[in-house]
């Protein structure tokens, strides 16, 4: 399996675009991209044909640092304003199963499955997969 450190490898904008590209392939959807700067809680968005709103937010954080719970709580407030049907959080860093559970609980009801919390290990797994349309 690949073992890229996305925090050190990519600049914030590059990581956001990379995350969007990976999620588009994984989910087989087209995500709208937005300009740099304050994003009101969404780095990318898809409105499905049946009107569902899927939001993707990417966070480029170092593995060495503590998980930024304060920042995640602020993102949850933004999600509460948007009220997406589904929220996909892409992290450049890895998390423990307990941290993933707490993130999912924090973002309830928007994060609908553990797969909606994509970590650095997950991203490396997608890159190492032979299945181009990974889902």
Which residues are covered by each model-predicted region?
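Mixed-charge (Asp/Glu-Lys/Arg
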Residues: 1-135
């Amino acid at each position: 399996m690949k073992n890229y450190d996305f925090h050190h490898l990519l600049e914030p904008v590059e990581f956001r675009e990379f995350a969007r590209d990976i999620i588009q392939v994984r989910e087989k959807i087209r995500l709208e991209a937005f300009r740099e700067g304050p994003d009101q809680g969404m780095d990318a968005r898809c409105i499905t044909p049946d009107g569902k709103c899927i939001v993707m937010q990417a966070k480029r954080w170092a593995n060495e640092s503590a998980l930024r719970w304060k920042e995640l709580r602020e993102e949850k407030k933004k999600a509460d304003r948007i009220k997406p049907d589904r929220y996909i959080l892409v992290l450049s860093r890895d998390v423990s199963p307990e941290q993933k559970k707490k993130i999912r609980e924090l973002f309830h009801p928007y994060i609908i499955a553990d797969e909606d919390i994509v970590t650095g290990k997950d991203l490396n797994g997608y890159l190492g997969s032979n299945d181009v349309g990974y889902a």
